[in-house]
Amino acid sequence: MSNRKLGRTSSQRKAMLRDLTTDLIINETIVTTEARAKEVRRTVEKMITLGKKGDLSARRAAAAYVRNEIAIKDFNEETETFPTALQKLFNDLAKRYEGRNGGYTRILKVEPRRGDAAPMAIIELV
């Protein structure tokens, strides 16, 4: 299975996709270029599928990819803590998509970027 180069070296591309995947898990919607959105869709779908599995092996595989960032938006009143992106993936998103087999994301095309007219898109969790 091939992937888009996105004008970067393989290590830069992998880091960018990890960052975008983590951002999408935390914020549930991001604005990026169309090509990046299509690549991020692949990784996010895989991460949510791992979240639905929920076993130790799936948790370790997801932890190896998703950054250890705090989901600031989701403050837990009971424990007075902020969950990490990984906790949100396995606790919230896995429950939300329990009955759905794939198709967890939606890509909406928007107007081109002003500076270079790059095709832009909004990618969001359904």
Curated annotation (Swiss-Prot):
Quaternary structure (record): Part of the 50S ribosomal subunit. Contacts protein L32.
One Pfam family this sequence matches: Ribosomal_L17
GO MF entries: structural constituent of ribosome
InterPro entries referenced in this protein's UniProt entry, alphabetically: Ribosomal_bL17, Ribosomal_bL17_CS, Ribosomal_bL17_sf
Keywords recorded for this protein, A-Z: Ribonucleoprotein, Ribosomal protein
GO terms, biological process: translation
Species per Swiss-Prot/TrEMBL record: Lactococcus lactis subsp. cremoris (strain MG1363)
This protein's name: Large ribosomal subunit protein bL17
GO cellular component, one term: cytosolic large ribosomal subunit
PROSITE patterns the record matches: RIBOSOMAL_L17 (PS01167)
Keyword Ribonucleoprotein on entry: yes
Family of the protein in this entry: Belongs to the bacterial ribosomal protein bL17 family.
